[in-house]
Amino acid sequence: MFKALKRDRAFYGYLLRLTGPIALQNLITFSLGLIDTLMVSQLGNNEMAAVTAANVPVFLLISIVFGVQSGVGILISQYWGKKDLPSISRAIGVAAGLGVALALVIALALFLWPVQIMDLMSNKHHLSLLGAPYLRVIGFSYVFNMLSSIYVSAQRSVENASFGMKLFGMSTVLNTGMNYLLIFGKCGFPMLGVEGAAIATLLSRVAEFAVCLFCALRSRVIPLDLKALFRPGWEMLRRFVTYASPVMAHELFWGLGNSLLTVILGHMTISVEFLAANAVMGNLNRLFLVVCFGLGAATAVMIGKAIGEGQSHDELMDLSRTLSWVTILVGAALAVIALALVPLLFQPVVFPLFKLYDLSAHLATTLAVTGFACIPFHAYSISAVTGILRAGGDVFWSTALDLAPQWLVALPLTALLALVLDADPWFVSLAIQAESFIKCPICLWRIRSRKWIHDVTLPEGER
């Protein structure tokens, strides 16, 4: 470990400059989810459970956005290592065309059949009626978010990690203000409840896109080649399909798996309380993982650039070892802090703030302890899958390692314990986390094999 961590100050300074803005961007984004949950929770547990259930299909949209963003980032980071700017414009063009088409199809489905889709998420029909107005609106916000996220990924991949932090900081302030006005009907605005939360999100996403469009047309770092952007060519489409579409499929099925976990909770005998607790703890858990997500994204940029520059396999292995150990140590520190805060802050202050009492508070504590204890495992998985393997062009294995433990272990085990055996919530919570224990050793084996290193910018015969 100590040998792997022995790097000069410039290395860690560069890692911090990449990680810091990305972590802050994620903190801002996840804080928005927490603020949304806090505001909706003031309407009652039923409203919060309804929005949690409505966000199950929405999470699929988020996963597709992240998949397109991550997939195009693989190509852009390696093209950036070669300083091939026209190919960056082509990659953005392909990603934008395919991404918007996918997001629009799902948004239309949510708009046309909201109640029917909500009925699949929970066995409580009154939650479907509460959540349907939210679902009709929220899907269209991710059409604009798709375009913004692709441009943020491009800026991040050319080492301008602060752009996304500034953009999402602006949109979070706007979204929070609009939430307050539209959910509660302040300053002369109508009181729209959960529908107001969706409209506020849509307006903030439109503002994000407008800022990205303005910056894209003026950027000197990656000046857009409009001809390459709108006519990217079949070769770029082929490369995107080869290397980015598996990432998109990966994120889609990973998102579907997470959504099914929520559906399982939504069909328990204590579904309203479990959904409310899960809504709060899901957001809090993500807040503690923001640094790990930042390190994972920074790892992807550094690995992708190093491959594009033509560094040797030994150099790439040394780099991957260093980044892995940094992530594990950071994850362990975060786990200790988070677990200490459960009795000191969450139980006496945070849970009552979100109207979680009695059974809901007990379930939230259960989810907190199991989720926080697994942070080091999540941290390494994020760095290995979304950072090292994915940036190395090892798309098949990064997908298999992330999906197999989830679909073959976590989902069936959680369903068995929650729906068939009606097991204690502690066992259900541990089953939700089971995939992490399996994923980590397999990721380590794959990275040590060195077979994950691929230069995806080279023609087929030269790799």
Which sequence ranges carry the predicted segments?
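Short alpha-helical transmembrane segments in multi-pass integral membrane proteins
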Residues: 1-22, 76-141, 189-244, 303-374, ...
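N-terminal transmembrane alpha-helices
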Residues: 7-38, 42-43, 59-71, 75, ...
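Transmembrane helical elements of multi-pass membrane transporters/channels
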Residues: 17-36, 137, 148, 171, ...
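Hydrophobic/aromatic residues within transmembrane alpha-helices of membrane transport systems
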Residues: 24, 36-40, 51, 76, ...
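Helix-terminus/linker motif at the lipid-water interface of multi-pass membrane proteins
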Residues: 27-49, 118-125, 181-192, 252-283, ...
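Small-residue-rich hydrophobic transmembrane alpha-helices
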Residues: 48-108, 145-164, 275-342, 379-398
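Hydrophobic transmembrane alpha-helices of multi-pass small-molecule transporters
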Residues: 60-63, 175-179, 209-213, 286-290, ...
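Short runs within selected transmembrane alpha-helices of multi-pass transporters and secretion channels
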Residues: 69, 138-156, 164-172, 197-212, ...
